Every structure is written in C-alpha cells, then in structure tokens.
Amino acid sequence: MSHCTIFLYKYFPGKPRYQHCSFLHPLNHKLKSLFLPITGSRFLSNSTFSVSDSAHSHQAKPHVRNAQFDFKAYMLEKITAVNQALDAALPVREPVKIHEAMRYSLLLGGKRICPIVCLAACHLVGGDESTAMPSAAALEMIHAMSLMHDDLPCMDNDDLRRGRPSNHVVFGEGATVLAGYALIARAFEHIATATQGVGPGKILRVIGELAQLIGAEGVVGGQVVDLRCGGEGQMAIGLEQLEYIHLHKTAASVEASAVAGAVLGGASEEEIERLRKYSRSAGLLFQVVDDILDVTKSSEELGKTAGKDLAAGKTTYPKLLGMEKSREMAEKLKREAQEQLLGFDPIKAAPLIALVDFIAYRDK
C-alpha cells in the first residue's frame, strides 16, 4: 500500500466505473470561455443550441423538448449579476490593503461556475434566485480563497492566474494568506446576514455544506493528498488517488454549490441527491478537461501557466490514461452528469444541461 492510499476513503458509495464511450467532439455551436475581469466578459456568438441536442438522444428524447436555449445570453446575465453582487458584498474599507487583496482575486474574472450552479439549482427546484445570491457570492469568495492559497509557493507555486499575476506576486505571501482567511470569514458572514426568504434551518444547512467543502473532508483534504502524492520525488499515484484529489479539490465545490442552491430553493432530499451526483460528475469533468487543456494550450490561451503540473512530475489524467482515454472519460462524465437531470422540468434544467456541455467543450 502506498503512502497516499492511507489518506483515502470513498467520497461516495460504489467504485466509479469509467467505460469506453464516444470520442469527445465539439458542439455545432460551442462557446469559448473567454472571461475577463469584472469590467466585462466576452463570448463567441452563435451559442444558442437545442437542449435536446446537448444530451445523448436515446436518453434525452423522452424528457427534453426541442427548445432553443441561449446559453450565451444566460451566462452573460448571470455573470453580470454575480459580479455586481460580489462588488457590493466586499467594498473597499479599512484596512485598505487587505480589502484590496481580497477584491483583487475575487473580482479578477473567471467562469463563475460555482455561483451559477448555485443559482441554476435554486431555479431548477422552484426557488427564487435572489434567495440564493448571497450563497452564490459566498461560494465565489471561497473559490477565490482556494485559488489564492493554491498559487502560493508552498502549495502549487504559480505566478499567473486568469491572465494576471497571482495574488501573492502583487501583495506578498503574508497578505495573500490573510486575505484568504478574511474571504472565508466574509463568505459565512454574508450568508448569515444577507440571505432572505427562507428559515434559519435552511441557512444553517447551507453553512454546514460550505464548511464541509472547505475542511479536511473537502478542499483541504484534497490538497493534502495532492501535496503528498504524485509530485517530484513523491509516490506515484493511480486513478483512485487522482480521483480522490479532484473529487475534493474541484468537484466538492460544484457539489456544495448545487446543494446550497437546491436547499434554498426548497428541493426534496431525492432532488438534492440527484444534484449531488450531477455536480460530482460535472466537477470531475472540469478537471479532466483542465488537464487536457494543460497539455494542448499555451499559457497565453489558458491565462495560467501551461504544462506546469507535468513539469513538476505531478500526475494528470492525460499522463495516467493517455489523451484518448482522457477524452473518453470526459465524454462519459458529461453524459453521467446530464442523466441526473432527466425527470426535472426540461426548461428549468436547460442551464445545467448546457453548462456541462460548456465545461466539456471549453478551450481555456
């Protein structure tokens, strides 16, 4: 048994199965994820596509009508709303330096996938998105913190994030660590004080979900195993350990986002569980695609340092499985995520269906 294995436990029952499936192919109307800071976001045009085309036809036909969904317009609307909420939730105040460091990473742009999943899940189960917006903003604060700390020299040591210098390059390592702590505190404060329209029980459940996301059974647990396994001079890892790392570092964030939105929207426990499964598959899909892009795109195209994990000797999906198998795995995860949405209102499910396609076929 390797030193990595002793840290592992199953994140959810049953051993995941990755079978062969069709080769990853581009959408007829794909979106490029060209996201800029809060001053604006831009997409390619022609991003309206049929909801029924976004899942495999033999699974989607009984459920999804051939309705046109304008994903470009949806994303622009939600990103704008989230950016405005973040700006309002974290104004510059004393001490100015720490607030500037917090805002630098929080408002630096990005895909805003976690807050959008939160809002979409709330809407899917019949809730009011305004109820979920404080939690959506809090999730992005937590995500920003994780990226700030992930880039530190003692962690993954990256000087570039979203096409700009990483937080510690601009503000120094000490300020970055403290700004990350402050973002966590602000996230929970914001949920507790700004959430309206639901009872305290639901708010407490959301706070519990986000606390678990951050802790030893979430992002921290994944990062600990990541630091101990697969790097230069470390033990080699297999698919099970690699999956553990990314279920915790990446998929856990998407899962907490979906569950928070669903809880605030009044979902049943059965609906919450399906959205958990959706988000685990979508989160792993994001990481598999990220690893593929890391070896097929330049740093300029990605907005972060390309090929750094491979250069450091870390294990990635293409390194472990090869490019072809990694693409097959991505296609299967995409299908598994979308299958969890069968049975929901197809019109309300359209954003989450389209989001999985976007994750799968993005180019940065």
UniProtKB/Swiss-Prot annotation:
Family annotation (SUPFAM superfamilies): Terpenoid synthases
Primary localisation category: plastid
Entry's induction text: Induced by jasmonic acid, thus triggering sesterterpenoids accumulation and reducing feeding and growth of the herbivorus insect Spodoptera exigua. Accumulates transiently after salicylic acid treatment.
Note on cofactor: Binds 2 Mg(2+) ions per subunit.
Tissue: Strongly expressed in glandular trichomes, and, at low levels, in leaves, stems and flowers.
Cofactor(s) of this protein: Mg(2+)
Residues involved in Mg(2+) 2 binding: D150, D156
CDD domains: Trans_IPPS_HT (cd00685)
FT transit peptide: 1-51
Subcellular location(s) per record: Plastid, Chloroplast
Binding sites annotated in the UniProt record for Mg(2+) 1: D150, D156
Function: Involved in the biosynthesis of leucosceptrane sesterterpenoids natural products, which are playing defensive roles toward herbivorus insects (e.g. Spodoptera exigua). Catalyzes the condensation of isopentenyl pyrophosphate (IDP) with the allylic pyrophosphates to yield geranylfarnesyl diphosphate (GFDP), the C(25) prenyl diphosphate precursor to all sesterterpenoids. Geranylgeranyl diphosphate (GGPP) is the preferred substrate, however dimethylallyl diphosphate (DMADP), farnesyl diphosphate (FDP) and geranyl diphosphate (GDP) can also be used as allylic substrate.
Record protein name field: Geranylfarnesyl diphosphate synthase, chloroplastic
Origin organism lineage: Eukaryota, Viridiplantae, Streptophyta, Embryophyta, Tracheophyta
